Amino acid sequence: MKFTVIITEAPYGKERAYSALRFALTALLEGIEVNIFLLENGVYVAKKEQNPSEVPNYLELLKNAIELGAVVKVCGPCCKARGLKEEDLIEGAKLATMHDLIAFVKESDNVVTF
């Protein structure tokens, strides 16, 4: 079984990205393959060098998901519109296009959007 998790919200403003990452990690721990696609303001979830002091560290959750086998792709045009480059992203997160998102959806049994 394979899930694609689409994250559209930035971290630290709302809890959607946090819920998405918890969902992805739980699926991985249950042996389900997971693709994560960061879209719109969700691209900020993969921005490296985040160090929040009083809330859960989303970046660490994303790194954990990658370590457990999640494939993470980040919308390139969304990054460009926000001044982010691939070198601004954590290791394991790759710039992508809508073609990549379509490929994720086609190969998945379920797609969940947060």
Swiss-Prot record:
GO terms for cellular component: cytosol. InterPro entries: DsrEFH-like, Sulphur_relay_DsrE/F-like. Coiled coil: none annotated. Pfam families: DsrE. To M.kandleri MK0008. This is Uncharacterized protein MJ0989. It comes from Methanocaldococcus jannaschii (strain ATCC 43067 / DSM 2661 / JAL-1 / JCM 10045 / NBRC 100440) (Methanococcus jannaschii).
